[in-house]
């Protein structure tokens, strides 16, 4: 597999992480280096590990994973999305919104945005292609796109109405990504 093909796959896989990072950038009040590091590290790590897991899973479980991977990604994204919407209606003054770069929310987003990379790993095993170089490029590309998405999102968050409804906009983006994943897997046709 040539370098251009690997990079093309990496960019395509990074798009979900990029979109989620934009939503996270809008959602967060201020973004520090820790936010950048946590989100980029986790998204990059999960994007790099999933092809390796898929590659080792190989043909033995390929059919099972391919049948349900899109549903897993959708339900994880929907779960996080509905929690964000629920939190947006919590009017308490002392209410603090959950940071998408911490805890269970971070892990769920990392898994949901990297499920497609698992399928890529399965494909690489079928093609008898080594997974190590693609996994490295995929992880680094996802981390870079995540940082770019956070930067774009934080700038977009300066728009007053967008800042006020950031959690709902972010939830909508996550739900849209989940629905797009289902559409790409032929659920709606």
Curated annotation (Swiss-Prot):
Q: Which InterPro entries match?
A: Mntp/YtaF, Put_MntP
Residues crossing the lipid bilayer are 6-26, 39-59, 71-91, 106-126, 131-151, 169-189
Q: What is its main location?
A: membrane
Subcellular location field? Cell inner membrane
Summary of the function given for this chain in its UniProt record? Probably functions as a manganese efflux pump.
Family membership: Belongs to the MntP (TC 9.B.29) family.
Q: What is the protein named? A: Putative manganese efflux pump MntP
């Amino acid at each position: 597999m040539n370098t251009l093909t690997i990079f093309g796959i990496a960019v395509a896989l990074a798009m979900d992480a990029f979109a989620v990072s934009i939503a996270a950038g809008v959602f967060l009040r201020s973004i520090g280096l820790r936010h950048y590091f946590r989100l980029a590290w986790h998204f990059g790590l999960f994007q790099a590990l999933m092809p390796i897991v898929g590659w080792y899973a190989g043909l033995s479980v390929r059919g099972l994973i391919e049948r349900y991977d899109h549903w897993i990604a959708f339900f994880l994204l929907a779960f996080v999305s509905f929690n964000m919407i629920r939190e947006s209606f919590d009017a308490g003054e002392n209410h603090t919104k959950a940071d998408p770069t911490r805890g269970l929310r971070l892990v769920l987003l990392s898994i949901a945005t990297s499920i497609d990379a698992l399928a890529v790993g399965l494909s690489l095993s079928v093609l008898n292609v080594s997974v190590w170089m693609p996994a490295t490029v995929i992880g680094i590309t996802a981390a870079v796109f995540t940082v770019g998405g956070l930067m774009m999102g934080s700038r977009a968050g300066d728009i007053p109405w967008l800042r006020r409804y950031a959690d709902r906009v972010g939830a909508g983006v996550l739900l849209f990504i989940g629905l797009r994943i289902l559409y790409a897997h032929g659920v709606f046709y």
